């Protein structure tokens, strides 16, 4: 922002303080180029600058191929002072905070770009009193100076409260810097407050010094570390917040304005290759860069939204953006100080910072005054009326602005929509989480199922491979198994066992049950958190509160009825009380029914969940037993397979033996082969006789191949048939084992279930016995209550009879009417007294108004005194400024004296140099050319120093000229002050004269107004009295008729209620009898149920015994089967050993068929027994369900009994209420018998009213005369009001003059601050010059010290060598730098 635009901006903010800002909505961006540090000049790369400032609003970045230009609100170069930065950036925001707007100032830039210096100042010294202090201390000073000014202007009518909080965001965690012991804090959002930090300490401050103490105390707790780019680098974002609350009172109306001033020091963005960060520093840098990138994303999104695009602004991605949400596109006036490093080494970070600042400049905030108006209702109504009149006046000239109500409605609608959206978002998040959990569970299930399928496939493959391998071995090998093959078979069997174990572990049913268990637990938790349960609890609390409130109201009404004596108020209150009690009873009944329903639902749900849990537990135990059985089966299968392998080995060996031995089923050469038939018995004997003769021939004769092949084929066919039979039997056996396993699981499940049911039944028995005892006790109590109610009913009947006798007396009605008339007369007298009291009250109000007028005059005098005080303060400040100027002059004089001393030193040095030059001229012939060159270089340096001294002298002259200019300005200000004093004195004299005249005329007006008011009051009171008397007479007549009707209706209603109560009592007794009978029936049913349960338990035990028997039978059958298999093996062995023939014996097949038939019969018997057991189990389950239904029905009946008991209690309470009402009616009747009014008094009062009318007509005539006088007074008043308006205009003019003077004073103060900063800068430069002069003096001393010519030559040569060496080193370093740059380019 240009300096010339400062005053314009301030005027805009002042003019828009009481309405939403329009022009100042855009974020103000201020770019500051880092001031040079002491060590910056020595660093390589900083000598080449990449920035140049074109004007106060634009800068140029020297980029390739073309330079880029950026324009901002203000651009500060290297020589800009801290005061100018504060004046352009912070002043306007602090002023807007004073007028009720929120304000934010934050510094942005890379690490080491001067953010902390800009916001705080130098870190070495005390920032609050230092001339180079930053924006935060200066904003404290300016804020509290504005507060003091407002307090002086408003006096006691305006008060301020300032609170400070200081937090930091470190590694995306919020910490309170004012409380070092605090842990991580949290951000919350409020409709009115906005985003705020929960639990942050707020300290009240009353001055700038206290605020700075709070800041420095928190700053010491901030996390700071050193990096290669910065000695003290901020490792966190610091946010210092000042809450300003101003309260202004005017005519009992309180205007409260609250505003927030956020002063933010952001941590700088950094690159790891530049800072060389490692470990914790690297993590900190990552978190800093992440939060700053979120800030950049938010700004780009806000720019897109401003351009009309629909984008989501991700405030919640970072704690920093969420905290500064109102500052970025919200309710705040924001200024950004973009700090930039001018060195070419930081070109990338500088470019990104400038781009960020350019985007931020496009954001527009919507700042609104945070104001709340409170006060008396009458005062607020008057204010509203005044504002409406102003609006009507404005409407005649221009269109009215948009109403605030529509805005508020829009805001409220927006907030409602936002809350709904947030609720939907939370619900969707919860649903999403639950769905993700379900998906993960389903994925686990699918994985387990896939594993199960794979394991099954592997088992099938293993078995097929094993069968194929055994067949091959059987066909190919002639001997036993090799050891390698046996090992391989064992390994394969082990693999198969492992797959079976994995199959058991990843069984899908187990996973499914686990998932169902998890889902049921979640459902249980969800149902516990259901709204009906919570609502029932809330309804209980509400009903208790309502009942207590109703009881307190009824007791209060009864006390008031006892204290009062009249009949009419009781007659009005009693029906109201009756209606209220009826309503409360109805509400009670509804609430109790709802409670009972909710409790019933909750109990049912509990029972269902318990049953479900029991079933799941039983299933789990059955599955565990099934797993054990499977493991046993695995071990059995292992043993069976080992036996089968050994048997196959034996069979193979025997078959080989049979094949290799020679047979006797053929004859050699031409001998026929004998057939094995039953007809060959005789031939067999002959054959056996000649067998000894033929043995030698058979043994010596070779076996023909055809016979070998036939024998082999026969054996192979027989083996196949046997194998097929074996496989079929094995399949049947597997099926039977699988069925047995299922039966075993089912039996285990039933056993576990039966144990659980036994436990349940035992617990329910105990509960039923307890309930039975409770019911019996309740029945006894109810019987006692019934007896009590019967006695009370008899008592009530006697009372009702007495009341009927009393009610028949009609003469008492006349006495009640007379009583009412007398009460009317007393009321009329009371009202007359009230009117007189009102009259007195009005007079007191008039006196109070006079006192207020006097107070206003006193306040005007106080204002005059405050104005005088302000003038004195102005004088004091001008004196202080003049003293400061004098001090400044003295300091300038001291500087001049220092300069003179320096000049004298320079002259002395010149003289020394002249002497040296004369010596060198004498020794010119002997000296070399090199020494002359060195001397010339020394002379050039001296000339440079002299030129610098001359520049300093020129600067000093400029400072003197600026001092003269400031003195002229001060003299002109003094002259203007004197002229203003004269004008103010004249104005004050005129004001005093006008005050005296106004006071005199106001007194006359007040007296006239009072007389007029008195007359009006009298006239109005007379008219009101007359009308009220008429209305009262009519009301009394109507009330008498109403009372008669109400009495008649009351009697009828009481008769009806009495009859209803009798019927209710009879019904209650019947219900009690029914309940007793029902309880007896229930006890009988319970006993029968217990007996049935015992029977069922006996049945279950019998079934268990049968199951055990069946198990034993199955085991016996297994043993028989094994025995028969052994017999089969024995038969096979005998067939193999028999040398008669290669074929099987004829009885083998028949024996096998018989065995198979017996096995089939046994299997069918097992199936029949299984079906019978299943039928028995289903019957038992049905019986159990029937018993459960009966138990539930009995519970419902018990609940109905409890409801009946509650209804009987309610009837008793009704009886008590009716008895109380009857007592009230008796008392009213007794009171009505005592008083009798007189009708004659009405006539007397009417005559008095006629007389009053005549008197009032006379008063009206006098009033007309007074009105004419009043009009004259009003015209005079109008003239005085015009004079008052002129006076107010003059006061406003004086206020504008005062504000101008304040602004000029602030400008002078800022100029003085700038001059102080320049003075410090010049002093630093002077110190640098002194050091350089001292260095030159030392060098000269060295040169002077070397008087010997040979020593001088050696010294010069040494210097030359050092210079050459340094030049070579610099060239090497430059070459290495160029090489590294080229290497980086080639790598990129």
Curated annotation (Swiss-Prot):
<feature type="modified residue" description="Phosphoserine">
    <location>
        <position position="1141"/>
    </location>
</feature>
<feature type="region of interest" description="Disordered">
    <location>
        <begin position="1228"/>
        <end position="1250"/>
    </location>
</feature>
<dbReference type="GO" id="GO:0005524">
    <property type="term" value="F:ATP binding"/>
</dbReference>
<comment type="similarity">
    <text>Belongs to the TRAFAC class myosin-kinesin ATPase superfamily. Kinesin family. KLP2 subfamily.</text>
</comment>
<dbReference type="InterPro" id="IPR036961">
    <property type="entry name" value="Kinesin_motor_dom_sf"/>
</dbReference>
<feature type="modified residue" description="Phosphoserine">
    <location>
        <position position="568"/>
    </location>
</feature>
<dbReference type="GO" id="GO:0003774">
    <property type="term" value="F:cytoskeletal motor activity"/>
</dbReference>
<keyword id="KW-0175">Coiled coil</keyword>
<dbReference type="GO" id="GO:0008017">
    <property type="term" value="F:microtubule binding"/>
</dbReference>
<feature type="modified residue" description="Phosphoserine">
    <location>
        <position position="1169"/>
    </location>
</feature>
<comment type="function">
    <text>Plus-end directed kinesin-like motor enzyme involved in mitotic spindle assembly.</text>
</comment>
<dbReference type="GO" id="GO:0008574">
    <property type="term" value="F:plus-end-directed microtubule motor activity"/>
</dbReference>
<dbReference type="InterPro" id="IPR031794">
    <property type="entry name" value="HMMR_C"/>
</dbReference>
<comment type="subunit">
    <text>Interacts with MKI67 and TPX2.</text>
</comment>
<feature type="compositionally biased region" description="Polar residues">
    <location>
        <begin position="10"/>
        <end position="22"/>
    </location>
</feature>
<keyword id="KW-0547">Nucleotide-binding</keyword>
<feature type="binding site">
    <location>
        <begin position="109"/>
        <end position="116"/>
    </location>
    <ligand>
        <name>ATP</name>
    </ligand>
</feature>
<dbReference type="InterPro" id="IPR001752">
    <property type="entry name" value="Kinesin_motor_dom"/>
</dbReference>
<feature type="modified residue" description="Phosphothreonine">
    <location>
        <position position="399"/>
    </location>
</feature>
<dbReference type="GO" id="GO:0005871">
    <property type="term" value="C:kinesin complex"/>
</dbReference>
<dbReference type="GO" id="GO:0005813">
    <property type="term" value="C:centrosome"/>
</dbReference>
<dbReference type="InterPro" id="IPR044986">
    <property type="entry name" value="KIF15/KIN-12"/>
</dbReference>
<dbReference type="Pfam" id="PF15908">
    <property type="entry name" value="HMMR_C"/>
</dbReference>
<protein>
    <recommendedName>
        <fullName>Kinesin-like protein KIF15</fullName>
    </recommendedName>
</protein>
<dbReference type="GO" id="GO:0000278">
    <property type="term" value="P:mitotic cell cycle"/>
</dbReference>
<dbReference type="Pfam" id="PF00225">
    <property type="entry name" value="Kinesin"/>
</dbReference>
<dbReference type="GO" id="GO:0005874">
    <property type="term" value="C:microtubule"/>
</dbReference>
<dbReference type="GO" id="GO:0016020">
    <property type="term" value="C:membrane"/>
</dbReference>
<dbReference type="GO" id="GO:0007018">
    <property type="term" value="P:microtubule-based movement"/>
</dbReference>
<feature type="region of interest" description="Disordered">
    <location>
        <begin position="1"/>
        <end position="25"/>
    </location>
</feature>
<keyword id="KW-0007">Acetylation</keyword>
<keyword id="KW-0597">Phosphoprotein</keyword>
<dbReference type="GO" id="GO:0005829">
    <property type="term" value="C:cytosol"/>
</dbReference>
<keyword id="KW-0206">Cytoskeleton</keyword>
<dbReference type="GO" id="GO:0000922">
    <property type="term" value="C:spindle pole"/>
</dbReference>
<keyword id="KW-0493">Microtubule</keyword>
<dbReference type="GO" id="GO:0005873">
    <property type="term" value="C:plus-end kinesin complex"/>
</dbReference>
<feature type="domain" description="Kinesin motor">
    <location>
        <begin position="26"/>
        <end position="363"/>
    </location>
</feature>
<dbReference type="GO" id="GO:0016887">
    <property type="term" value="F:ATP hydrolysis activity"/>
</dbReference>
<dbReference type="GO" id="GO:0051299">
    <property type="term" value="P:centrosome separation"/>
</dbReference>
<keyword id="KW-0067">ATP-binding</keyword>
<dbReference type="GO" id="GO:0005737">
    <property type="term" value="C:cytoplasm"/>
</dbReference>
